[in-house]
Amino acid sequence: MKRNANPAATVAAWNSAYPVGTEVDYRFHRAAAPKRTRTTTEAQVLGRHTAVVWLAGVSGCVALSHCEPA
């Protein structure tokens, strides 16, 4: 999912399309190989500026811009 000027809208769209437990491909950075994992929470807005989600086996939250549904 790409960055969005309105993170609340990004979170709402993500949560309506992808329930908790959805498999995603996560990239730590753009050149990294994707890691297949699953969401463990609904997406949330972090610090009023970034849409994030928590993933199984990953420490901390991850920006939705680093995740693609599998």
Task: Locate the predicted segments by residue.
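Basic/aromatic-rich interaction segments and small domains that mediate binding to polyanionic partners
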Residues: 23-69
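Mixed-charge, Lys/Arg-rich low-complexity intrinsically disordered regions
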Residues: 1-20, 30
